[in-house]
A protein has these predicted regions:
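Adenine nucleotide-associated cytosolic modules
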Residues: 1-283
Length: 283
């Protein structure tokens, strides 16, 4: 990302934010290449934020065809079925994002994540993953070369539950259970319903026994709430997408340390919590 200076056009367009974080940070952003795999309401908000911030390029991967259900959370999809009918989520989002900032190159890459090798991912400075299974995330982490001082995803989720802080967000434990259930049942993220609750509760009990925790450590009511309606809650998407955009901008620009290393937001109480999951986690 080092090398070229900002053009006169870039300097004029990004004048306000240059005053906030400086020309060097903006130059780093303008040379950054971002990959987003998996389009939903949250990543749509993220894409909007980094396109407005002025990254060099944004590549989208998601071959799913747009549906009426996707409209509720993804504001980048036109509401007219004659426009979105038969098109993929990435095609529609690409067209909308180009209008936000014509100076950012927005493109679509077709294909399945599992078919892309390390050479493909090496073209990008930041890779954002959403809408994929636990096993897919773990495989991608093995494929993508990273430069970081933070624990890897695999290291973080491997920390024994007994070693985590006593006030650790219950959302973390509940999400781990549901994610494992989806993986075991070969479901895509969000493909759970209230009919799956008995199986989810059974897996929770097995988890708690294996981790030497009481079954009450993960409230049944929380799991029931999460499987009853696993769809995105539209008002939350701008919040999470905004925070994700902020952290990626930090990582690229060097202006501030990205949060370490998990962020949880509970729409029920409107609170966001940062949790540090690493082998150095204390109780």
């Amino acid at each position: 990302m080092d090398g070229e200076e900002l053009t006169e056009q870039e300097t004029a367009l990004y004048d306000r934010q240059i005053r906030v974080w400086g020309a060097d940070a903006q130059r780093r952003l303008s040379k950054a290449h971002i990959l987003v795999c998996g389009i939903n309401g949250t990543t749509a908000e993220f894409c909007k934020n980094i396109v407005l911030a002025g990254v060099g390029s944004l590549t989208l991967v998601d071959d799913r065809v747009a549906t009426e259900e996707a409209l509720s959370a993804n504001f980048l999809i036109p509401s007219d079925e004659s426009v979105y009918g038969g098109k993929t989520l990435t095609e529609l989002c690409r067209d909308s994002l180009k209008d936000f900032n014509p100076m950012v190159r927005v493109s679509v890459e077709k294909g399945d994540l599992s078919n892309f090798g390390g050479e493909f991912y090496s073209k990008f400075d930041v890779v954002v993953i959403s809408c994929c299974s636990l096993s897919t995330k773990q495989k991608l982490e093995e494929t993508i070369e990273c430069q970081h001082n933070y624990p890897s995803f695999e290291e973080s989720i491997s920390v024994p539950w007994k070693a985590l802080p006593r006030k650790m967000s219950k959302l973390y434990f509940a999400m781990r259970v549901i994610e494992r259930f989806e993986d075991a049942e070969q479901r895509k993220p969000g493909e759970v319903s209230i009919a799956d609750l008995p199986g989810v509760l059974k897996l929770k009990n097995e988890f708690c026994e294996a981790q030497s925790l009481k079954e009450s450590h993960i409230p049944d009511a929380l799991l029931e709430r999460l499987v009853t309606d696993p769809r995105e809650f539209p008002p939350v998407c701008p919040i999470i997408g905004g925070i994700l955009g902020q952290e990626v901008i930090k990582a690229i620009s060097g202006k501030g340390e990205p949060l370490k290393n998990f962020f949880f937001f509970d729409a029920m109480d409107g609170k966001g919590i940062i949790e540090d999951l690493s082998n150095n986690t204390g109780s």
